[in-house]
Amino acid sequence: MDMIRKSVISLGLVLLATPVIFGQDLSRYRKFALGSSLAVISKQVGQDGRQATLISESPALVQEITYWQMDASDGTSRSEPISHITFDFFNGALYRIVVVYDQKSIEGLTEDDMVKAISARYGIGVRLYPEIDFPSHDVYAAPEKVIARWDDSENSVTFFHSTGLESFGLSVFSKRLSAQAEAAIIESAKFAKEQAPQKEIDRQIKEVDDQDIARQKNIKSFRP
């Protein structure tokens, strides 16, 4: 009987602990939520959404805005340990948030220190040995290594090291929308490559036409 009672108590403790371990929301980073519109995020960070960087226009619209954390005006250390945050949008919906931490704000912290702090927000993650490459649509970007990862069925959070920036970062993304966005970016790049020869021909023809128009105009008005 005591054994049964202990088993029931243990099971109850596990069930109570489950929401704490697995109930974290992987669709958010602080006040920013995946799926939010470009207009909403632009307003939250005080930017004009019309100035978003165009990554791909076809077969789907992929855009990006970057928010830079400013130092305190009084010269004191910044209140947030963030260098900048990049927001990526697929057809107007936020599908990825990439946070890069300020070097001075995390000076002295080990990878394990940061994984522990992130786990307090997102629950138990998976430490990766060896580290794996962090995907990026920028082919010229320096390599980034994923150190740890937190997953649910729809979203993922990754803690990575940025070689180019010599700092660490956090990425929060929708698995479904990220896959669609990356496919669209690849297709757009492929189409642009296929169209490049014809675009160069069109450019050269236009250049010749423009020069001829300028010649005809100037030959009438030229007085030596």
Named regions from a protein language model:
Residues M1-L11:
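Bacterial N-terminal signal peptides that target proteins for export
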Residues G23-Y29, S83, N91:
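Short N-terminal signal/transit or membrane-insertion segments
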Residues Q24-L61, Y101-P224:
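Non-cytosolic coordination micro-motifs
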Residues E64-T110:
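Mid-chain, structured segments of secreted extracytoplasmic proteins
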